[in-house]
Amino acid sequence: ARSMYEPFNRIKFAQFASYYDQMRAGVKYFVEQKDKKSVCAMYQHTDFGRDVYSGAVDQVKAMNMTIVAETSHKPTDTDFSASLARLRNARCDLIAVGTIVRDTDMILSTAKKMGWDVTFLGQFASYDTGVAEAPGDIGEGFYSMSPSLIAYPDDPRASVQEFSRAYKSRFGINPNFMGEMGYAAAQVVILALDRAERELTLEKFLAAMEGIQGYRDIFGSPPITMSPTDHHWLDPGMASGGKEWPLGAGGRWMALGRARLASRAGPPQRPP
């Protein structure tokens, strides 16, 4: 959420770009690089969903466009037939979605049953193996913004394989992207605690966090650099995750391209 790093707060650190910024970057990418002309929106009627929706609205406005049609739903809704029919009638060619995993899967499944081949664009909350590996190949044509790509258990890097084995041994399932990023976040905090040493104070911990420069996690995320005026961990460049279906295998997220954040020209500044 934008509230994690805007405005600046000396005891807040943000790991990723906000949902708002992710959607702005994604919409800009698809309009400019994929020639999308009719942008629509589907979103949860929650603070989260409205933040995603705001990103889509502000980006199309910045490009002298408008949202052609939109629908909202409760997180508990299960029937999306009418909503999708409305968007189909509006001739949308890109649907920006403020959804998570469960409602994303139901929306994609419904669209496939309708025979509607349209591009859906999600954000970090929908960048999950639960979408990519959903039965029936429903994830084909769905894209999500993400700070980096998920590292699968068969990744050639020994450190990733070791993490995946330990994770599955403890929890009984392979790690998803949220699991990987949670581990990466913990490693950054541990690094700062080590540098702050045993006589820990708030000031020493903040100084240690702000002194992290160019740290790379084991998953290949962009380098993490912070400072006394910038508590936003990752570079504002975003990877746009697409998805493909290899023959005889489950769905996997694949890189589509990179898009700069549309609304964040630089780090938030500490107030005087």
Name every feature range the model reports, one short phrase each.
Residues 232, 236-268, 272:
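Acidic, proline/serine/threonine- and glycine-rich low-complexity intrinsically disordered segments
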Residues 1-70, 119-144:
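Extracytoplasmic ligand/sensor domains, especially the bilobed periplasmic-binding protein
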Residues 169-179, 190-249:
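Segments of small-molecule ligand-sensing domains
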Residues 1-5, 73-80, 100-105:
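Beta-alpha junction/loop-to-helix N-cap segments that form part of ligand/metal-binding clefts
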Residues 15-38, 79-81, 104, 130, ...:
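Hydrophobic alpha-helical segments within soluble ligand-binding/sensing domains
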Residues 9, 108-183, 194-196, 200, ...:
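Extracellular/periplasmic periplasmic-binding protein-like sensory domains
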Residues 28-36, 57-65, 85-92, 109-116, ...:
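Sec-exported extracytoplasmic/periplasmic mature domains
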Residues 40-43, 91-101, 107, 118-123, ...:
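Periplasmic-binding protein-like
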